[in-house]
Amino acid sequence: MRKITFIAYALLFAFTSSLFANEVNIFSARHYDSDVQLYEKFTAKTGIKVNVISGKSGALEKRIKEEGADSKADLYITADAGRLGAFQANLQGGLASDTIKSAVPSNFRTSKWVGIAKRARIVYFAPERVSGAELAGLTYESLADPKWKGRLVIRASNNIYNQSLVASLIKNNGKGKISDWSKGMVSNMARAPKGNDRAQILAVAAGEADIAVANTYYLALMLSGKKGPEQQAAAKKVKPFFPNQD
């Protein structure tokens, strides 16, 4: 497989030698006009043409791996550092940009990738059914507390956001404790996991659950009205809570 750089907009970014050529090929799972504007400014400043191949992360990764050494990808932008594993052996190393190093804290970069954005994975609650006392001192770990039995919704465990959350909990608490924690989480679920992050927020708004775990980005997206008036109205019925703040 061709050596590529890996970018996750939640956590990754890096340059290859292609940036010293006349064009650079970016495989991107992002879909924002602001990115296009950045590419245009980059081309205007450097004279380097930016070719963007857009798609969902899974499809882009499949294409890159199938094309192997023939892949044209120079940079890959995706949604989570957890996706790094699929390309670990094929990433371009040697990131040497002093500008990047000064702008990005060391815990959000390596020699092969660097973060360009972050999203918080937090708890959403129904204010009419969840009291302030219940939320006091809430942590990700305490979501396994039996008091939340039948009240929690979260998307499936094969979701990369959940996998990264669990990885961080294992790092901080150890595999044994988080194995027990995961069983408690399952016991507390109001329903079998289904749907995306917005579906979890919708479930709380509809009274199917009292709390949900989802990324902050999705509440803002729903509140913006871009996903329709129904989701906008639902988003106004829930409140965000940031765990592990003590």
Task: Please identify what each model-predicted range represents.
Residues 1-8:
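Bacterial N-terminal signal peptides that target proteins for export
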Residues 15-21:
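Sec/Tat signal peptide C-region and signal peptidase I cleavage site
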Residues 21-86:
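Early extracytoplasmic/lumenal segment of secretory-pathway proteins
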Residues 22, 48-49, 71-74, 148-151, ...:
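Loop/turn elements at helix/coil->beta-strand transitions in domains of secreted/extracellular proteins
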Residues 29, 33, 59, 72-208, ...:
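Extracytoplasmic ligand-binding site segments that recognize negatively charged/polar headgroups
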Residues 46, 95, 176-177, 229-234:
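Short helix-capping segments at alpha-helix termini
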